[in-house]
Structure formats: C-alpha cells, structure tokens
C-alpha cells in the first residue's frame, strides 16, 4: 500500500511539472509551508490507569498545486509533523513522553472562491512511529496513531500570489490500537486511539 502511495505521489509531481511546461488553462505552483500542529486525540484507556495528554507541536513540508482554469485545483503535499504526548501513571509511578514523528501525503481537491480556497481530500500516512522510553531507558513502540488513509479539510488564502495561509483539520476514520508497556520485558496494556489534528501553516509560493 505504501509503495503504491509513493508511486502515486511521484506521478503527481511529474504531472505537475509537465503541466508547468505550458498546458493551456493550467497553472502550477510550488511552495514550502510551516506552522503549528495541534493533535486532538481521543484515548480509550480500557483498564489502564495511565493518563495521556497530546501536546502542540509543529508541521512543515512541500506544497504543490495544479490550478485548472483558475477555479479548480489538485493539491498534493508532503507534510512532516512532530509533537509529544505526555504519559503519566501515578499508580505505577511512571512518567514519560511519547515522541510522535509523522510523514503524510495529503491529496486535496481545491475549489477557489475569490481569495479563499476550500480544500478537502484523503491523507496517506507514509511514516508514523511514536516511541517512548520505559523504566530501563529502552525504546518502546507505542504503535501508529493514524490509519493508512485518513482525511483533511480546510481553507486557505493566497495573498499577492506568494504568501499562503492555510488552516485545516484532519484525522482518522477509525480508532487504532496502541500498547503501553513500562518494562519492555513485560506484557503491555492495549488502548484505543482516535487521532484528529488541527494545523495552521504559513507558506511561500514560487
């Protein structure tokens, strides 16, 4: 699945570059974006006594756009995001931070109305490997936060054809399973996570 996504992204980048060569009625744009990534997580802890709190992080990446007759657009992106989840278990006397590194490829359809663009589409997760350290300092895999395919929707504004301001929300269609283990040699506890996020990014278009 992930190999197919990589091939799809490569084809989209190639199509964008080709369209930039002079296809009538089609305009391309490239840019870089960066900003705030705020996770909105719902944790179903089951029998676990732990408490989890997702903290705000950052997001940055590459923005591409294929604008058709100035109104409709196809907008593939490559976005990396990073944030931490605070893990606290008073009963087990254990505290740590789960470090979340995520690489996603939104493939959005964009509709322009004046200065505003309305964007919606699927998001493909290529990398999602949250980890934390157990009592002995060993790295433990928490398990992925997003399913392979999730969604994103939002609005963006392009000013002076160079400055892009983008706000969006996104998340998974279903919960994923994660594992809490304070000792890598012991069996862990399983919880369910439904992950959403909100992002506010500013970009420069070329």
Positions of predicted regions on the chain:
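Membrane-embedded beta-strands of outer-membrane beta-barrel proteins
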Residues: 60-62, 105-107, 151-153, 167, ...
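Flexible, solvent-exposed loop segments that connect beta-strands
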Residues: 40-52, 82-101, 128-147, 175-193
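Outer-membrane beta-barrel biogenesis signature
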Residues: 5-8, 12-33, 206
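Residues that define the transmembrane beta-barrel architecture of outer-membrane proteins
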Residues: 26-28, 52-58, 99-103, 114, ...
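Residue-level signature of outer-membrane beta-barrel architecture
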Residues: 64-66, 109-113, 157-159, 204
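Transmembrane beta-barrel strands of outer-membrane/channel proteins
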Residues: 32-38, 76-80, 120-124, 153, ...
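Outer-membrane beta-barrel "beta-signal"
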Residues: 33, 157, 161, 192-206
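Repeated loop/turn-to-beta-strand initiation elements of outer-membrane beta-barrel proteins
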Residues: 71-74, 115-118, 161-165
